[in-house]
Design a protein with these regions (language model features):
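Hydrophobic alpha-helical bundle cores within soluble ligand-binding/oligomerization subdomains
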Residues: 1-172
Length: 172
């Protein structure tokens, strides 16, 4: 909490001065971009850690076991630990349940007003999907977890539909 005061971290993404959340303060992720060699800091190949786990180890494990690691990593980021098989199965089932978009969402939000930029398209989808949530102001933990899970479940859909729209648009 002291770091939040010391670095003047605001709630939310940005304040009027453009300051935002410093990722390192949350201890959810960490990066290594320099190493000490003979008392001197030198650049190194980057290393990324989620909740203390090397992303290389997470990916390596998923590849060795011939499985996808997306849902396991999402669980780790949300809940702070790797899931058991039972927890992962329940989490995956919940994501599957949330992996639907409202009727006409693709047509009205993605197809009717396409953008050239993928990030703008994704941002538009996230902002638009909020209008379908009747509990946007509920900041209780269960509701925020639900909202996070819905975003985790639907975000890949936004990217796929937007990419498909761009591909089909180029063929016209």
């Amino acid at each position: 909490a002291d770091d939040y005061v010391r670095y003047d971290v605001k709630c939310g993404l940005r304040d009027l001065n453009g300051k935002g959340v410093l990722a390192g303060l949350t201890e959810i992720s960490d990066i290594v971009s320099k190493k000490m060699v003979d008392g001197e800091e030198i650049p190194c190949e980057g290393e990324l850690y989620y909740r203390g786990y090397s992303i290389q180890d997470l990916v390596g494990s998923a590849l060795r076991e011939k499985r996808f690691g997306f849902e396991e990593t999402a669980y780790l980021l949300l809940f702070g630990q790797l899931p058991t098989e039972t927890e992962l199965s329940a989490f995956s089932a919940q994501l599957s349940y949330y992996r639907t978009l409202p009727k006409n969402f693709v047509r009205d939000v993605i197809l009717k007003s396409p953008t050239q930029d993928m990030m703008n398209s994704l941002a538009k989808c996230v902002l638009s999907i909020a209008s379908y949530d009747d509990k946007t102001d509920d900041i209780s933990l269960p509701n925020v977890v639900r909202q996070c899970m819905q975003l985790i479940a639907t975000f890949p859909l936004y990217a796929v539909y937007r990419s498909e729209e761009r591909r089909v648009g180029k063929e016209r």
